[in-house]
Amino acid sequence: MSNKVLLSTLCALAVCCLPADSRPRTSPPNDAAFLSMAAQADMTIAHIGQMAENRAATDKVKNFAKTVVQDHTNDYWELTGVASKAGDQIPKAINSQNERMITALERSKGKAFDRDFLTRQSAEHERLISAFKQEAEYGTNPVIKDYARKALPTIERHLHDAQDLLKQRS
C-alpha cells in the first residue's frame, strides 16, 4: 500500500474515532438554508410589525402587529439556540431583498398601509407554513425538525389572524 493511501486511510479513521462533540458540526445544506430563511423571516416580519404598530390606521391592525413582533422576536431568539445546537449560525441582519420589500411598504400610508401590511403578512406566513411543514417532515436534523414542528401553530395563527383582518376590511 502506498504511503499516500495509508495516510489518507489513517486520517479518515482518526476523524471517525473523534468523540462526537469534537467533530465539526454543520447542518446539511437544506437544514442550513431553512435556518437562514426562518431567521430572515423572523427579522423582517418583526421589523414590519414594529412599523405597523406605529403606522397602522386601526387598533386591530396595531394589536395584530404587536403580537407578530413579540412572537417573531421570541422565535428569532429560540432559533438562535436551535442553530447553535445544530452547529450553525443564523443571519443577524435583514438581507437586501427583504430591505427592498420593507422600503416598498414604507411608502404606504393610512388604510392602504393596513391593507399592504396584512397582505404581506398573509403571503409571508403562507410561505412560512409551507417551508416549516417541509422541514418538519423532510429535515434531517432532529433538533431543527422539532423546532419547525413546534413553531407551526403560531405561524398558522398569524396567517389566520391576518386573513381575518383582511376580510374585515372588505
Predicted regions and their residues:
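Repetitive helical segments and hydrophobic/amphipathic motifs
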Residues: A12-L13
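His/Met- and acidic-residue-enriched segments that coordinate or traffic transition-metal cofactors
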Residues: S2-S8, C17-S170
